[in-house]
């Protein structure tokens, strides 16, 4: 905000910025984004795994970085490939990169244009009557527009104030699918609370009801409105749940309930380690991925590995049109709305709720519980939501 206020309107109509954890090197201005190398300036969300090897290749050409970051190496690689054609340089450069990245790039000789490309890390973009905008999360867009698109992996977006042009891996112009943001700017503000976390704690009852009630038909768990048929739960002899961070803890809750009701073995793996374990997966395995954003790079990689090995795949995500949602066989959306706070609250609660719903439906389909049992579980869930709401009325007394 400070930079935006200090920059006069006539200085530029194009800019990029990014706040990133100090994953490489210390916290310093030198290691901060954007990074510039020659004619290339970029910001980067993700991690370049082979940056050391690339740094050695650049050093052999007499090119040394100023910072300690993998991002500057990426900028140097793109600049090294640049001969006047931005898209050709980006294509050549990303063929050398290993890892996750979402790049927004400005070339100094084309200063009013942003080029964007991604692999693993999310990028969403929109064109409005005030220009073009791109970000890693749609929360950043909601104050500007209700419509956006998700940039596909390997596609290159060219953003100017007048338009956004997207090209696929073959250089052909691609018309992306436009998504609608169903919540408004008020959902992304504190709404009278001191902190986003406190606001989101109090939003749990509504989020839980929005997640549970559409899946309750005649008192029973039902996913037909989600397009998830009972065939997903048949011919399965093993369930694997994979996720990262808080989402993985919801998976542990799911494991407990699924094993208890369905009497089927369930393993929960942290997604960042899943690929390196050579997991035992086949066509009789159901892989459940859990991710609030639907863009968690390690979870997405785990999903792809499971699909390669023939597993059925089901994702539990909050963001429609996200990569994990698109690439899964089946999707169950949580309806938490935006979660701004770093500490997960309502997103975790609805993930647990969906895991329980999966357990109830799986057990019912396979004859492990009766309809009466299933209806009782659903009633208990709704009653629990009411109790959560009641408990939150005592927040002032417990502070």
Model-derived features: where do they sit?
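Residue-identity detector for glutamine
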Residues: 55, 68, 204, 277, ...
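Glycine-rich phosphate-binding loops that contact phosphosugars or nucleotide phosphates
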Residues: 234-383
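Conserved short alpha-helical segments that host acidic/polar catalytic motifs at enzyme active sites
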Residues: 1-190, 194-195, 206-237, 371, ...
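Accessory alpha-helical/coil subdomains and C-terminal extensions
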Residues: 383-399
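Well-ordered alpha-helical segments embedded in enzymatic catalytic cores
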Residues: 89, 207, 228, 273, ...
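Active-site cores of enzymes that catalyze phosphoryl transfer or operate on phosphate-rich substrates
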Residues: 190, 200, 342
């Amino acid at each position: 905000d400070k930079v935006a206020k200090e920059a006069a309107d006539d200085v530029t109509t194009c800019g990029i910025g990014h706040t990133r954890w100090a994953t490489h090197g210390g916290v310093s201005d030198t290691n901060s984004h954007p990074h510039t190398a020659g004619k290339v300036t970029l910001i980067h969300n993700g991690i370049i795994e082979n940056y050391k090897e690339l740094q050695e290749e650049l050093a052999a050409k007499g090119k040394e970085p100023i910072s300690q970051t993998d991002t500057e190496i990426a900028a140097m690689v793109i600049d090294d490939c640049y001969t006047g054609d931005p898209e050709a340089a980006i294509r050549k450069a990303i063929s050398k990169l290993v890892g996750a990245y979402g790049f927004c790039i400005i070339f100094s000789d084309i200063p009013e244009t942003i080029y964007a490309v991604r692999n693993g890390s999310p990028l969403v973009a929109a064109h409005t009557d005030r220009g073009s905008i791109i970000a890693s999360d749609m929360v950043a867009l909601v104050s500007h527009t209700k419509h956006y698109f998700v940039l596909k992996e390997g596609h290159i977006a060219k953003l100017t104030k007048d338009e956004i042009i997207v090209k696929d891996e073959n250089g052909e112009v691609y018309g992306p699918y436009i998504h609608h943001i169903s919540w408004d700017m008020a959902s992304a503000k504190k709404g009278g609370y001191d902190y986003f976390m406190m606001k989101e704690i109090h939003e749990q009852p509504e989020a839980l009801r929005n997640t549970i009630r559409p899946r309750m038909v005649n008192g029973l768990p039902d996913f037909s409105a989600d397009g998830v048929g009972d065939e997903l739960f048949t011919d399965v002899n093993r369930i694997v749940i994979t996720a990262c961070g808080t989402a993985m803890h919801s998976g542990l809750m799911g494991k407990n309930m699924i094993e208890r009701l369905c009497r089927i073995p369930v393993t929960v793996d942290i997604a960042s380690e899943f690929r390196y374990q050579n997991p035992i997966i086949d066509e009789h395995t159901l892989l459940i991925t859990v991710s609030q954003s639907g863009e968690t790079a390690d979870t997405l990689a785990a999903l792809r590995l499971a699909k390669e090995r023939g597993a059925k795949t089901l994702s539990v995500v909050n963001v429609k049109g996200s990569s994990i949602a698109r690439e899964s066989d089946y999707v169950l959306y949580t309806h938490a709305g935006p979660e701004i706070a770093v500490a997960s609250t309502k997103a975790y609660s609805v993930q647990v709720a969906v895991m329980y719903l999966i357990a109830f439906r799986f057990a019912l389909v396979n004859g492990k519980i009766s309809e009466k049992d299933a209806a009782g579980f659903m009633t208990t869930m709704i009653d629990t939501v009411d109790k959560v709401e009641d408990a939150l009325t005592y927040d002032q007394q417990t502070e």
